[in-house]
């Protein structure tokens, strides 16, 4: 009962700040002023020129978004004031793990039939006319002028940092391998370290080294051929018969090329040695009168080659 009272009270407070559907333009203006005084959902500072500023003027848009988010948080804090809540329910909800809540919800949905699963109803009340006009103008600018919000965000200086992806993951504490499915359906962190490619590469390298070593050992083995016992005599007889037939066939198949090449012998020159005994004294006349003589002693052998 306490939970139902809280929901009804929050809806009643939200209805007070929202515009009634039956009000006209005057009623809308009055309610808009009331929401501005009381800190409504959307402030008038959320103006038309948020995206008309060139270059890096989108920072003002971020500041206005922060102000609007703060105001919405204030409204939520006002609507969430409990009247007389049961402290046991709050403590139990705080103690439970969010993953357990998701798992329990998924189990309930999986056990339901397709007819029982329905889309939740739209929230009661009406959105502020100022916010509707704002969205309508932005949509018209997108259709007519081709304004792209993603391009405006990407053009900012803060998003030109090459390491912005890692910084955002660290700042927002995002789990890249995480999932919204419960663990009983899919658990991305349930794999062991051996399942990742680094450990698989190491194991593969070890197995390849073992195979290479085995191949090297196989090449070192010496194979010895053997013959059966009792077949030695037959083997020798057959070998001699085959050898004799091979010799006979070779003799029958002689051709002109099998004849021996005649070898021509070149006669070596004969050396004749003649021994000549020359006189011991040779007289040489130096003048016509022959009065003076000189003596030359000559003793030896003269070698003479025979003419061919």
Curated annotation (Swiss-Prot):
GO BP: regulation of DNA-templated transcription; response to virus
Any one of the GO CC terms: intermediate filament cytoskeleton
InterPro entries reported in the protein's UniProt record: SAP30BP
Biased composition (Acidic residues): 57-78
Residue numbers carrying Phosphoserine: 18, 22, 43, 52, 113
Keywords per UniProt: Isopeptide bond, Nucleus, Phosphoprotein, Repressor, Transcription, Transcription regulation, Ubl conjugation
Crosslink feature (Glycyl lysine isopeptide (Lys-Gly) (interchain with G-Cter in SUMO2)) location: 95, 220, 304-305
Record's keyword annotation contains Cytoplasm: no
Main location: nucleus
Renumbered residue ranges of the record's region Disordered: 15-101
Disulfides per UniProt: none
Cell compartment(s), UniProt: Nucleus
Regions of compositional bias (Basic and acidic residues) in chain numbering: 79-99
Coiled coil: none
Family: Belongs to the HCNGP family.
Complex and partners: Interacts with histone deacetylase complex subunit SAP30.
Task of the protein: Plays a role in transcriptional repression by promoting histone deacetylase activity, leading to deacetylation of histone H3. May be involved in the regulation of beta-2-microglobulin genes.
Protein name: SAP30-binding protein
Gene transcribed to yield this protein: Sap30bp
């Amino acid at each position: 009962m306490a939970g139902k009272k809280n929901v009804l009270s929050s809806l009643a407070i939200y209805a007070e700040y929202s515009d009634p559907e039956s009000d006209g333009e005057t009623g809308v203006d009055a309610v808009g002023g009331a929401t501005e005084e009381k800190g409504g959902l959307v402030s008038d500072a959320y103006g038309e020129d948020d995206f008309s500023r060139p270059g890096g003027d989108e920072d003002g848009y971020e500041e206005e978004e922060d102000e609007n988010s703060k105001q919405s948080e204030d409204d939520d804090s006002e609507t969430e004031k409990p009247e007389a809540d049961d402290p046991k329910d709050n403590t139990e909800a705080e103690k439970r793990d969010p993953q357990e809540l998701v798992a329990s919800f998924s189990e309930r949905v999986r056990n339901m039939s397709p007819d029982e699963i329905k889309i939740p109803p739209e929230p009661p009340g009406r959105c502020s006319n100022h916010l509707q006009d704002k969205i309508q103008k932005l949509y018209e600018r997108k259709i007519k002028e081709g304004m792209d919000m993603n391009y405006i965000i990407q053009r900012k200086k803060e998003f030109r940092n090459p390491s912005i992806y890692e910084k955002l993951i660290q700042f927002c504490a995002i789990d890249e391998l995480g999932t919204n499915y419960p663990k009983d359906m899919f658990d991305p962190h349930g794999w062991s370290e051996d399942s990742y490619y680094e450990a698989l590469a190491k194991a593969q390298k070890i197995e390849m080294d073992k195979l290479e070593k085995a191949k090297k050992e196989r090449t070192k083995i010496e194979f010895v051929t053997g013959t059966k016992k009792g077949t030695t005599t037959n083997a020798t007889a057959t070998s001699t018969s085959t050898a004799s037939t091979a010799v006979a066939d070779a003799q029958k198949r002689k051709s002109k090329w099998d004849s021996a090449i005649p070898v021509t012998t070149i006669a070596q020159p004969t050396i004749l040695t003649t021994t000549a005994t020359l006189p011991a004294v040779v007289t040489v006349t130096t003048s016509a009168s022959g009065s003076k003589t000189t003596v030359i002693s000559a003793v030896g052998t003269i070698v003479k080659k025979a003419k061919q």
